Curated annotation (Swiss-Prot):
Purpose of the protein: Displays ATPase and GTPase activities.
Pfam families according to UniProt: PapZ_C, RapZ-like_N
Keyword Oxidoreductase applies: no
Keyword ATP-binding: yes
Species this protein is from: Polaromonas sp. (strain JS666 / ATCC BAA-500)
Residues that hold ATP according to the record: G6, M7, S8, G9, S10, G11, K12, S13
Top-level taxonomic group: Bacteria
Family affiliation: Belongs to the RapZ-like family.
SUPFAM superfamilies: P-loop containing nucleoside triphosphate hydrolases
Binding site for GTP: D55, V56, R57, S58
Organism placement in taxonomy: Bacteria, Pseudomonadati, Pseudomonadota, Betaproteobacteria, Burkholderiales
Keywords, ordered alphabetically: ATP-binding, GTP-binding, Nucleotide-binding
GO molecular function: ATP binding; GTP binding
Descriptive protein name: Nucleotide-binding protein Bpro_1300
Length: 283
């Protein structure tokens, strides 16, 4: 079973459609009180893949969900909980473009922009506990098609194992909201200042050759690798399904991309591993 919650405007419907395309039986806006009975009813008809979406309109009942999920897991149900998020600026823009009213917004307020921002911040507060107990997906800078592909890749990972997600990003565009660990690599030599490398990315061999020729780059890779090696088993014992490791540099094009590629290759030999290049994927 996949449970999708998150901020209004973050792409929950897009994620649910992706799961429907992947063969899941999908239910939108299921009241939290019906979660356990619904799953039990589904299992009477034989095991099948189920995806359920809940939103802030069920906020008063959402505190019931974590206990229900634990009960389902104790009964042998495989549960994946995803929380979709985006920064406030992005959510405001999306609501403005679609001219939709936020579920918590007051329509009788003169300053509609302020009312929308207040509604978003209230929603963050109401959904805080669910966010803490779920794998967070930051949709601020990805298109609907990219979100669909990413959701499908997440659910395709072996459920009983910890899945590592390595993500490159540019600090100038903000730290990803879904990051569990953030490593700053802006102190490393920057290929941007090499005319022959500026237009390339960390996926290109010439950039990789340039970076691995510097001892500090190799030291950074080994330090991150050692840190993760030390703590991954503790995360498994904590019943984590996903861990997102974000690597940031100035532009999100060279250094962070190179290290994400290298880390994904290294850890992919032992763990289910996914990788994202936020700035490159954004085009």
């Amino acid at each position: 079973m996949v449970l999708i919650t998150g901020m209004s405007g973050s792409g929950k419907s897009v994620a649910l459609h992706a799961l429907e395309d992947a063969g899941y039986y999908c239910v939108d806006n299921l009241p939290p009180e019906l979660l356990t009975p619904f799953v039990a009813l589904e299992h009477q008809h034989g095991p099948r893949k189920v995806a359920i979406a809940m939103d802030v309109r069920s906020a008063t009942s959402l505190p019931l969900v974590p206990q229900q999920l634990r009960q389902l897991q104790a009964q042998g149900v495989t549960v994946q909980s995803l929380f979709l998020d985006a920064n406030t600026e992005t959510l405001v823009r999306r609501f403005s473009e679609t001219r939709r009213l936020h579920p918590l917004s007051r329509g009788d307020t003169a300053d509609q922009h302020r009312a929308l921002v207040d509604a978003i911040e209230l929603e963050r507060e109401l959904l805080g506990d669910m966010r803490e107990q779920s794998h967070v997906l930051d949709t601020s800078m990805i298109r609907a098609s990219q979100l669909q592909a990413y959701v499908k890749s997440l659910i395709a990972a072996p459920a009983p194992q910890l899945t590592l997600v390595f993500e490159s990003f540019a600090f100038k565009r903000g730290v990803p909201l879904d990051a569990d660990y953030v490593f700053d690599v802006r102190m490393l030599p920057n290929p941007h200042y090499e005319p022959d490398l500026r237009h390339l990315t960390g996926c290109d061999l010439a950039v990789a050759d340039y970076l691995k020729a510097h001892a500090e780059v190799n030291d950074m890779f080994r330090d991150i690798e050692k840190f993760l090696d030390h703590w991954l088993q503790a995360l498994v014992r904590d019943h984590r399904s996903y861990v997102t490791v974000a690597i940031g540099c100035t532009g999100g094009q060279h250094r962070s991309v190179y290290l994400v590629e290298k880390l994904a290759e290294s850890f992919g030999r032992q763990w289910p591993t996914l990788k994202r290049h936020r700035e490159l994927d954004a085009g």
